[in-house]
């Protein structure tokens, strides 16, 4: 019991008690490229500490893989250039990618191994026609029970739930009462709570909300978040990529403890048009994806036509 209590205290004070150092020159871009390429996606980390970042355009579009030092390793086979949101999950002890296909004419979801093997594909036609026929799917993740959740964040704001076999189960949430979602951009399963919840980035409303696993509205977790795009967890902490600049780190109660890379120039955030010559070290433009690594370091990928990654290491 004492060990559990001590761990809880350490995690709860982690961000408040430590500072973060911006890592200049991280990562090293693929050979021959000055930037990673047009980015409007996500970043996540595998169990070996390698980073996976989705890139929508350029010579190395798809998913680029970097080691912890920032060295480019390779691109992931069969990863498409429309993986707007994806999550690295563990299945039977193996790392697996769950990806939503934004703007695809036939595919809603792909499940890939980290070798690039296609393990499951869910077609758009799996969603019943009475629910809709035009979608803009922005993120996917695996529920604690193995179900697949995909969110329609650039269209209806509805959350689509499929079984592990890819068969459609139901749709939930949306723009109506009580959710009132407006650009439900991405989400994550919040296992800090029992039972687990869904933490949704309600981007246009500048807030994070909690749903139960059925999609029922529970509560507003945090407000005043500047266009939240994605969330990731490290112990009791959650980091939030904010399209209107900066990475916020919140505690379990939804209180902002730290803000990294804040930009005070409105012309340089909430846009993908800030060219490399205008980038400032340690200052974000439009963070779109973010992840913690196992040590609590923070990496973000921006919405940027040239493509940009930034990293902060926690000072212990």
Each PLM stretch: what is its role?
Residues 56-58, 102-104, 153-155, 192, ...:
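Short loop/turn segments immediately following the C-termini of beta-strands
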Residues 29-30, 59-97, 102, 126-128:
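Blade-loop segments of beta-propeller domains
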Residues 50-53, 96-99, 147-150, 197-200, ...:
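Conserved beta-propeller blade signature
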Residues 24-61, 304-307:
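Beta-strand-rich domains and repeat architectures in extracellular enzymes and scaffolds
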Residues 283-316:
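Blade-level signature of beta-propeller repeat domains, shared across WD40, Kelch, NHL, RCC1
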Residues 17-36, 272-280:
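A short helix->beta-strand "capping" segment at the edge of beta-propeller domains
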Residues 34-48, 80-93, 126-147, 177-197, ...:
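Beta-rich, blade/repeat-based domains predominating
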Residues 66-71, 113-117, 163-167, 212-216, ...:
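Short loop/turn segments that connect beta-strands within beta-propeller blades
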